[in-house]
Amino acid sequence: PEHYPIVDFILGLEKDDILSNPARKTYYKTFSSPMQRILTAYCQSGGNLLVSGSYIGSDMSNSQGNREFTEKILKYGFQGSLKDTRSGQITGLGRTLQIPRLPNEKAYAVTAPDCIVPVDSAFPVFVYQPGQYSAGIAYKGNYRVFAMGFPFESIESETDRAIVMAAILKFFGEK
């Protein structure tokens, strides 16, 4: 953390996708085994980690080791993917945000963002609307984690992105 007080790990739509190209299996994994070791060491040394992406839960739910990493280190559990609604509305941090759920000409579609729930002493920070499914968590312990089950960059409003990032940076800076 002395060199990198905050790490922003932006995953977008990245996931393990063996069906479309078997050769790329580990390259697109959200958190490969080596990356899990690096992020674990970073967190255990007191770092501040921001993680966002549509598949940060679903891509990690296929093995006990992957689930242990997300639950014990990143402090969230996977509750499912939001596939049944087309609403791109998310509430949290005193804001109502919008993400694109359908294909459009301006930004990539976030068709199935992950519902991630807090584990241990983590707490919810974002909720998908309607339905009240958890969309993001924060953890404050010997290190800090702020995780979003949707890509940060998919927040449509530039103003909302700036306000959310300012709130995250403030959370990381609190004593």
PLM region descriptions:
Residues 1-2, 136:
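Short amphipathic alpha-helices and their capping/turn segments at secondary-structure boundaries
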Residues 2-7, 44-49, 143-144, 175:
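Loop/turn elements at helix/coil->beta-strand transitions in domains of secreted/extracellular proteins
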Residues 4-19, 53-54, 148-150:
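Short loop/turn segments at strand-loop or loop-helix junctions that form parts
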Residues 14-110, 120-122, 130:
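A glycine-rich, often tryptophan-bearing local segment used as a flexible ligand/cofactor-contacting loop or short
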Residues 61, 65-83, 118-123, 131-175:
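Extracellular ligand-binding/catalytic regions of CAZymes and related secreted enzymes
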Residues 112-115, 124:
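Glycan-recognition and catalytic regions of carbohydrate-active enzymes
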